[in-house]
């Protein structure tokens, strides 16, 4: 690909609207925690390329160099103006540079890499043009949908290659020579090794999205094998929420003289439009207080986070018995059931999603009014990801955490990481306990239904579907893109 003349980047620093847990790389970065910071990523060279800034504000995708037809697609999808990660990375991508983008889920990073790839595809159409690697099946499906929507005017063809689906039908899709492949690493490697005639020797673009999660899910060795069969002459984009040592090793192995775009804030910073509070209650009353809160916010969309699969299923049953439109989401559901749950929640045919941390990160759920931590997460980073499902894109939102006598130490660690004491949500106990009888009846119903579910599935209560690998054992390649939670 010819090297294009470097354009000057027009952008002014503005607060990052997304909850972020990115590490500051220096004390100066900490002092400018809400500024977008653009740095060179070639750590082995002290003279890494830097991008000069200008004072003018980028107001449109056209200003970034995006062609009219793609600008029209952005407008049709409601993309009014570029997000910070888009404003920073798109001009550099159009110059033909490899990129590292540090930004959170919900920051608009999918369009940040999709638009340059689609624009290059329109200039030189070919099959098997781009490969996007994602850590989970749901995220792969969402990325494919974004490419098809943005590339609708040129009828871009995408193939989603993920675990849990039929290999033969996927091989047929690959045989039709799609423009873009969106895949999870394990299943892609299966096809590279076993599908006759399938090769990526002509690939022009590689994207590794949520690279930190790819490595957290132990995809590292598989990524190494995939990289060995890809052409060296390609453009590579790596997007990650954090820049860990593993991610740094991956970027050194896969990118050529990249530039780093960092839309960063304090490690545990939350947005100003997010109202966070907690309820300190006895453990035995958790169900009753949860129902009280959901009644207080009746008609609004909510995600209720739990720690285990069984608790997710139990609460979904309990809430349905009380007349709430609830649906569970966890890693033991089949792929079609998980996609169905997300679809119902997005369309608001169900307004309460009861979920494990499957839903904390990486899923395209555009508007959530309330987040309720029924079970506290075990670490502050997960808390940030959970509450980041609300108060997105400048909207306001509420996050409630139920804290019991067993959670005090964990809660204090979360507050310490946030750097502030959160407000207690005061309620009259008498008002809450009015619900005691109704909730008790629903609890008994949930216990009975859970027992029936376990008996039907031949389970003894450990999980609802299948069994987890023994401690220390590794999941098979086909199951690695399936969330555990």
Curated annotation (Swiss-Prot):
Signal peptide: none
Assigned keywords, A-Z: ATP-binding, Helicase, Hydrolase, Nucleotide-binding, Nucleus, Ribosome biogenesis, RNA-binding, rRNA processing
Feature: compositional bias, Basic and acidic residues: 449-458, 475-485
Bias-annotated ranges (Low complexity): 20-32
GO terms of biological process kind: rRNA processing
GO-annotated cellular components: cytosol; nucleus
Domain of life where this protein originates: Eukaryota
Reaction equation(s) it catalyzes: ATP + H2O = ADP + phosphate + H(+)
Self-association state and partner proteins as the record states: Interacts with the SSU processome.
Function: ATP-dependent rRNA helicase required for pre-ribosomal RNA processing. Involved in the maturation of the 35S-pre-rRNA and to its cleavage to mature 18S rRNA.
Protein name: ATP-dependent rRNA helicase RRP3
Species lineage: Eukaryota, Fungi, Dikarya, Ascomycota, Pezizomycotina
Gene: RRP3
